[in-house]
From Swiss-Prot:
Region (Disordered): 1-37
Transmembrane segments: 45-65
Protein localization: Endoplasmic reticulum membrane
Keywords (A to Z) from UniProt: Acetylation, Endoplasmic reticulum, Membrane, Transmembrane, Transmembrane helix
One Pfam family here: ALN
Sequence positions bearing N-acetylmethionine: M1
Protein name stated in the entry: Sarcoplasmic/endoplasmic reticulum calcium ATPase regulator ARLN
Lineage: Eukaryota, Metazoa, Chordata, Craniata, Vertebrata
Organism: Homo sapiens (Human)
Function: Inhibits the activity of the calcium ATPases ATP2A2/SERCA2 and ATP2A3/SERCA3 by decreasing their apparent affinity for Ca(2+).
PANTHER family per UniProt: CHROMOSOME 4 OPEN READING FRAME 3
């Protein structure tokens, strides 16, 4: 039997081809996480400003408690 020949029932060649196509297809399915306008979906600056605003509101609420 030759080194490059498929197995007895021919499944080795199919398995190799299927594995190769699945591996190649995985690269095409990866898409960048972005919104409709091209900006990133998750804005860390927005999170920062919301966190600061929340802290200020909580501080003022606790400070002015009777």
């Amino acid at each position: 039997m030759e080194v490059d020949a498929p197995g007895v029932d021919g499944r080795d060649g199919l398995r190799e081809r299927r594995g190769f196509s699945e591996g190649g297809r995985q690269n095409f399915d990866v898409r960048p996480q972005s919104g409709a306008n091209g900006l990133p979906k998750h804005s860390y600056w927005l999170d920062l400003w919301l966190f600061i605003l929340f802290d200020v509101v909580v501080f003022l609420f606790v400070y002015f408690l009777p």
